[in-house]
């Protein structure tokens, strides 16, 4: 490997907003702050909530539905 062309690879501390601290190595050169990590992300914790906001079809059906009509 050539000398002087590679970035410095140092240990950094990654801190999540939930308080989880991860020590890793990176070329960033400074400590990082995360909003979400594997300890608090809803997908990994199993605390997901189903977002059923509806789409364009649901909005159309709601707007133009006839009250009392059969479905």
UniProtKB/Swiss-Prot annotation:
<feature type="binding site">
    <location>
        <position position="18"/>
    </location>
    <ligand>
        <name>Zn(2+)</name>
    </ligand>
</feature>
<keyword id="KW-0689">Ribosomal protein</keyword>
<dbReference type="InterPro" id="IPR042105">
    <property type="entry name" value="Ribosomal_bL31_sf"/>
</dbReference>
<comment type="function">
    <text>Binds the 23S rRNA.</text>
</comment>
<feature type="binding site">
    <location>
        <position position="40"/>
    </location>
    <ligand>
        <name>Zn(2+)</name>
    </ligand>
</feature>
<comment type="similarity">
    <text>Belongs to the bacterial ribosomal protein bL31 family. Type A subfamily.</text>
</comment>
<keyword id="KW-0862">Zinc</keyword>
<keyword id="KW-0694">RNA-binding</keyword>
<dbReference type="Pfam" id="PF01197">
    <property type="entry name" value="Ribosomal_L31"/>
</dbReference>
<dbReference type="GO" id="GO:0003735">
    <property type="term" value="F:structural constituent of ribosome"/>
</dbReference>
<feature type="binding site">
    <location>
        <position position="37"/>
    </location>
    <ligand>
        <name>Zn(2+)</name>
    </ligand>
</feature>
<keyword id="KW-0479">Metal-binding</keyword>
<dbReference type="InterPro" id="IPR002150">
    <property type="entry name" value="Ribosomal_bL31"/>
</dbReference>
<keyword id="KW-0699">rRNA-binding</keyword>
<dbReference type="GO" id="GO:1990904">
    <property type="term" value="C:ribonucleoprotein complex"/>
</dbReference>
<dbReference type="InterPro" id="IPR034704">
    <property type="entry name" value="Ribosomal_bL28/bL31-like_sf"/>
</dbReference>
<dbReference type="GO" id="GO:0019843">
    <property type="term" value="F:rRNA binding"/>
</dbReference>
<keyword id="KW-0687">Ribonucleoprotein</keyword>
<dbReference type="GO" id="GO:0006412">
    <property type="term" value="P:translation"/>
</dbReference>
<dbReference type="GO" id="GO:0046872">
    <property type="term" value="F:metal ion binding"/>
</dbReference>
<comment type="subunit">
    <text>Part of the 50S ribosomal subunit.</text>
</comment>
<protein>
    <recommendedName>
        <fullName>Large ribosomal subunit protein bL31</fullName>
    </recommendedName>
</protein>
<feature type="binding site">
    <location>
        <position position="16"/>
    </location>
    <ligand>
        <name>Zn(2+)</name>
    </ligand>
</feature>
<dbReference type="InterPro" id="IPR027491">
    <property type="entry name" value="Ribosomal_bL31_A"/>
</dbReference>
<dbReference type="GO" id="GO:0005840">
    <property type="term" value="C:ribosome"/>
</dbReference>
């Amino acid at each position: 490997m050539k000398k002087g062309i590679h970035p410095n690879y140092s240990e950094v501390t990654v801190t999540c907003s939930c308080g989880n601290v991860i020590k890793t190595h990176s070329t960033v050169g400074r400590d990082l702050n995360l909003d979400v990590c594997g300890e608090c992300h809803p997908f990994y914790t199993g605390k997901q909530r189903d977002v059923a906001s509806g789409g364009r079809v649901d909005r159309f059906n709601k707007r133009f539905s006839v009250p009392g009509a059969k479905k």
